[in-house]
Amino acid sequence: MNIKPGDRWCWFFDRQHDRLMLDLANGMVFRSRFPSKMLTPDAFDASSFCVDDAASYYHFAERCQASGLDTAQCAELVLNALVAQRFLKPIMPKSWYFTPQPGRYVPEMGELVGVQLLDTPDWGRLLVIAPGASASLCLLAQPSLALAGKRLMLGEAIKVMHDRLLPLSTHPETLSDDTTLACAG
């Protein structure tokens, strides 16, 4: 699924599906993973796909290439990243799922980061959407991740304190889905 942003793309809210949608103007419509209760008021008004959206799309798409996801999964992750960046309400950190890490690390927007699950040797891979002063909004950048009785799916949002994140470039580990993180180091 190779898609490229176009000037005819349009955001709209679909009440029947309770999801923000992106009309890709070629007969395809993307349905985001976020329900109305997670969206800002702007999400309920139709709006054009703007230049900033396109710039973020290319930034996230470039970074997603190192994720190990297939083309369709990358497209889904990138489009959900745009929704989260532009329309998601603030969420509280849920860092208690992850092991604290040594050092002071502050990720960049679009960076792939790793988190180690608390009390297990399993690791997860996240895409940073909006880095903050002490925590970052991230999306799950792997097919799924089991978190203490709950399962996160590809593209789901979670906010994580920076002291739980590690750059993938310095910490290769095995993910819970038996996929090895592609890292240098």
Curated annotation (Swiss-Prot):
Subcellular location: Cytoplasm
Keyword ATP-binding: no
Keywords, comma-separated and alphabetical: Cell cycle, Cell division, Cytoplasm, Septation
InterPro entries: ZapC, ZapC_C, ZapC_N
Signal sequence, start to end: none
Keyword Zinc-finger: no
GO process annotations (BP): division septum assembly; FtsZ-dependent cytokinesis
Any one of the GO CC terms: cytoplasm
Subunit structure comment from the entry: Interacts directly with FtsZ.
Family the UniProt entry places it in: Belongs to the ZapC family.
Function: Contributes to the efficiency of the cell division process by stabilizing the polymeric form of the cell division protein FtsZ. Acts by promoting interactions between FtsZ protofilaments and suppressing the GTPase activity of FtsZ.
The protein, known as: Cell division protein ZapC
Gene expressing this chain: zapC
